[in-house]
Amino acid sequence: LRGLVGSEMCIRDSDDAVWEHLEAFKENDKIGNPELYPYPGMDGTISPTTLRYMKNTFEMGFLLDGAEVGKVVEVGGGYGGLCRVLSKVCEFDEYILIDLPEVSALQRKYLDQFPDLKDKVTCIPSTEYEEIKDVDLFISNYALSECDLPTQMAYYDKVITNSKYVYMIYNLSLIHI
């Protein structure tokens, strides 16, 4: 990840990088009143969701092995927490979130609380997105597994095929509901 505060740290010493940026990651929990818990070996408390976003962030750093990331597209970004956590260690130029219209409004409200992200992040309702080109990193944490096949194929054709790297977590089910 370009600008990943020492991308080698992410790859070789992710433990050190986690501790170095932990307080910045915890800022994710200052809005919205999430449930916070203490964890062994860590001062203070943190939400399980922020911990998962930290895990996702360092997995991406490991898999990308120092590649530059200017444009990120995330489908189904929830309230925008992964964007916030990733921004603490990755100097992306543009982050596009695509989600349901109501969720896009929530993302905008949450991410507008952080001045460093306000002008870098675009929240696009899934009913309005078009083809997006020159994507460095495409992210989907479970979102595509919640979509029907035609919707999945539309994302594939309009975004994934235009992406250098894809980080996807997908629930596989033998029965599509």
In which residue ranges do the predicted regions lie?
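Short, small-residue-biased leader/transition segments that mark boundaries at the very start
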Residues: G3-I11
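Class I SAM-dependent methyltransferase Rossmann-like catalytic core
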Residues: N33-L64
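Conserved class I S-adenosyl-L-methionine
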Residues: E68-G78
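Conserved SAM-binding loop of SAM-dependent methyltransferases across substrates and taxa
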Residues: G80-C90
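S-adenosyl-L-methionine
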Residues: Y110-I132
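A short SAM/SAH-binding and catalytic strip from SAM-dependent methyltransferases
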Residues: F138-P150
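A short, conserved alpha-helix within the catalytic core of class I
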Residues: C147-V159
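Conserved beta-strand signature within the Rossmann-like core of class I S-adenosyl-L-methionine
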Residues: S163-S173
